[in-house]
Swiss-Prot record:
GO molecular function: follicle-stimulating hormone activity
Disulfide bonds: C35-C59, C38-C88, C56-C110, C60-C112, C87-C115
InterPro entries per record: Cystine-knot_cytokine, Glyco_hormone
Full protein name: Glycoprotein hormones alpha chain
PROSITE patterns: GLYCO_HORMONE_ALPHA_1 (PS00779), GLYCO_HORMONE_ALPHA_2 (PS00780), GLYCO_HORMONE_ALPHA_3 (PS50277)
A Pfam family that the UniProt record links to this protein: Hormone_6
SUPFAM superfamilies listed in its UniProt record: Cystine-knot cytokines (SSF57501)
Family statement: Belongs to the glycoprotein hormones subunit alpha family.
Organism per entry: Alexandromys montebelli (Japanese grass vole)
Length: 120
């Protein structure tokens, strides 16, 4: 009887580890690793049958490097690290009404450009 309990315990531990790892994976895109290129993707929240709403999503260029000494001298608040980045933004868009009252931008073309909104 102890023989079967040992295998049952091992099976339950392995099953719980598998379910935990499966639950911790991101939703969808399980095969794609890293960040996808900047492109249009359908916004499932605002899209309705016959009236899809698209938004720009994906990654662009970013890097950080030590601030050169001569640049630090001209800064009001000297910083040791300087960063550069471009964001995936809409090159063109149209305004559309969704849910009967909300006006949103339906992106039609994307490109990598200056970041206007940063997450803090």
């Amino acid at each position: 009887m102890d023989y079967y309990r040992k295998y049952a315990a091992v099976f339950l531990v392995m099953l719980s580890m598998f379910l935990h790892s499966l639950h911790s994976l991101p939703d969808g895109d399980l095969i794609i690793q890293g960040c996808p290129e900047c492109k249009l993707k359908e916004n499932k929240y605002f899209s309705r049958l016959g009236n899809p709403v698209y938004q720009c999503m994906g990654c662009c260029f970013s890097r950080a490097y030590p601030t050169p000494a001569r640049s630090k001298k001209t800064m009001l608040v000297p910083k040791n690290i300087t960063s550069e980045a471009t964001c995936c933004v809409a090159k063109s868009f149209t305004k559309t009404t969704v849910l009967g009252y909300a006006r949103v931008e339906n992106h039609t073309e994307c490109h990598c450009s200056t970041c206007y909104y940063h997450k803090v």
